[in-house]
């Protein structure tokens, strides 16, 4: 039996891992429908590891108190959305020192040119300017690789913007295994079934993002329902008044249909058929109602979790304990393979 077999055998489910940054006061609708909604389903069939990557968050300036508060809030939101600590391992990245330690090893295995070709770094550094871009942003992909490889997941759900980073992760895993001996699982990336790409309400050809140019294009899950309803009803559509699903020619209308479909479970085709002879006002009202029906109980659950900080921290401590046991063991194998002298007790 190899070292990898200790974590995964034919009798145990495959492991899946993903994370979401604590860089805003609320996760947005795109975060949920494009990722977290699928995490909730995956925890029923996989050995699921989900984490809050606060180390990644500090690649840009953060207010310390805000970061701490957002980390707690992020955990509460994930639990309120349906991440079950009995079926998933939920933890905070910085609670596991092995993430930063393995990141350094992987950084030393990464060529400068290889790292320089990462599209996300090039785009962000061009936008921010060299003087305002941290070296942490440059090494972000190697930290992401460490996040993944520490837990030997077979599957990693990723969006299109992270595919290049996952390919680097796979390359580094193979490079290490070939050079020093097999330690790492080489993970497969996948887009989970049912994942919905949600677009900006004011610019429906751009992905919904907290960094969007117009805040009215964003739906935050914890926003007052009246605010969210107003944003849905002011969403950009078009002038022909026909409700049809056509991403190329009717991106705004198509986006609203996808949102409503994902929230209600009705197929887009069935929704379109039901709007025959109706205008955009009906589509927007129904989508706003579906959103409110989803976020109202969510906010209540979130408030309940936030009212018991000690219980939240207990859940994260249990997750960190389990994650730490695995990560520490894998890091020890890495250190042994590369020739580090192991510490000994006196």
Swiss-Prot record:
Source gene? trpS
State the superkingdom. Answer: Bacteria
What NCBIfam families does its record include? trpS
The record's family statement is:
Belongs to the class-I aminoacyl-tRNA synthetase family.
Q: Which InterPro entries does this entry report, sorted A to Z?
A: aa-tRNA-synth_Ic (IPR002305), Rossmann-like_a/b/a_fold (IPR014729), Trp-tRNA-ligase (IPR002306), Trp-tRNA-ligase_bac-type (IPR024109), Trp-tRNA_synthetase (IPR050203)
- Return the motif ranges for 'HIGH' region: 22-31
Which subcellular locations apply to this protein? Cytoplasm
- The protein in question is named Tryptophan--tRNA ligase
Cite the binding residues for ATP: 21-23, 30-31, 159-161, 198, 207-211
Predominant cellular place of this UniProt entry's protein: cytoplasm
Where is the motif ('KMSKS' region)?
207-211
Q: Which residues bind L-tryptophan?
A: 147
**Which GO molecular function annotations are given, in alphabetical order?**
ATP binding; tryptophan-tRNA ligase activity
Known role: Catalyzes the attachment of tryptophan to tRNA(Trp).
Q: Does the keyword Ligase apply?
A: yes
Q: Does the keyword Acyltransferase apply?
A: no
What does the annotation say about its assembly with partners?
Answer: Homodimer.
Q: Name one GO cellular component term.
A: cytosol
Species per Swiss-Prot/TrEMBL record:
Corynebacterium efficiens (strain DSM 44549 / YS-314 / AJ 12310 / JCM 11189 / NBRC 100395)
EC number(s) on file: 6.1.1.2
Please tell me which top-level EC class this enzyme sits in.
ligase
What keywords appear on the UniProt entry? Aminoacyl-tRNA synthetase, ATP-binding, Cytoplasm, Ligase, Nucleotide-binding, Protein biosynthesis
User: Which reactions is this enzyme annotated as catalysing?
Assistant: tRNA(Trp) + L-tryptophan + ATP = L-tryptophyl-tRNA(Trp) + AMP + diphosphate + H(+)
Q: Which GO terms describe its biological process?
A: tryptophanyl-tRNA aminoacylation
């Amino acid at each position: 039996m190899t070292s990898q077999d200790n974590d995964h055998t034919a009798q145990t489910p495959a492991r899946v891992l993903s994370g979401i940054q604590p860089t805003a006061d609320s996760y947005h609708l795109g975060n949920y429908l494009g990722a977290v909604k699928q995490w909730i389903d995956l925890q029923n069939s996989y050995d699921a590891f989900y984490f809050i990557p606060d180390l990644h968050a500090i690649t840009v300036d953060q207010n310390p108190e805000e970061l701490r508060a957002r980390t707690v809030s992020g955990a509460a939101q994930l639990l309120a959305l349906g991440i079950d600590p009995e079926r998933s391992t939920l933890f905070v990245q910085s609670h596991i020192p092995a993430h930063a330690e393995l990141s350094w090893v992987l950084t030393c295995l990464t060529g400068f040119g290889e790292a320089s070709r990462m599209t996300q770094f090039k785009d962000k550094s061009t936008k921010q300017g060299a003087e305002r871009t941290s070296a942490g942003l440059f090494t972000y992909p190697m930290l992401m690789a460490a996040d993944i490889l520490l837990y030997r997941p077979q599957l990693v759900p990723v969006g299109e913007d992270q595919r290049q980073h996952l390919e680097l992760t796979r390359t580094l895993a193979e490079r290490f295994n070939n050079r020093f001996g097999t330690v790492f699982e080489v993970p497969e990336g996948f887009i989970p079934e049912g994942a919905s790409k949600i677009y900006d309400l004011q610019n429906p050809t751009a992905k919904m993002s907290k960094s969007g140019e117009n805040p009215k294009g964003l739906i935050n899950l914890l926003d007052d329902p009246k605010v969210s309803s107003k944003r849905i009803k002011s969403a950009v559509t078009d002038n022909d008044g026909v409700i049809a699903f056509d991403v190329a020619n009717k991106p705004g209308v198509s986006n609203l249909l996808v949102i409503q479909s994902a929230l209600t479970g009705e197929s887009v085709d069935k929704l379109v058929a039901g709007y025959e002879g109706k205008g955009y006002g009906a589509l927007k009202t129904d989508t706003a109602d579906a959103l409110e029906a989803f976020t109202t109980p969510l906010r209540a659950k979130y408030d309940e979790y936030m009212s018991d900080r000690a219980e939240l921290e207990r859940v994260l401590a249990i997750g960190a304990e389990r994650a730490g046991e695995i990560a520490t063991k894998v890091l020890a194998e890495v250190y042994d393979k590369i020739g580090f002298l192991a510490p000994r007790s006196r």
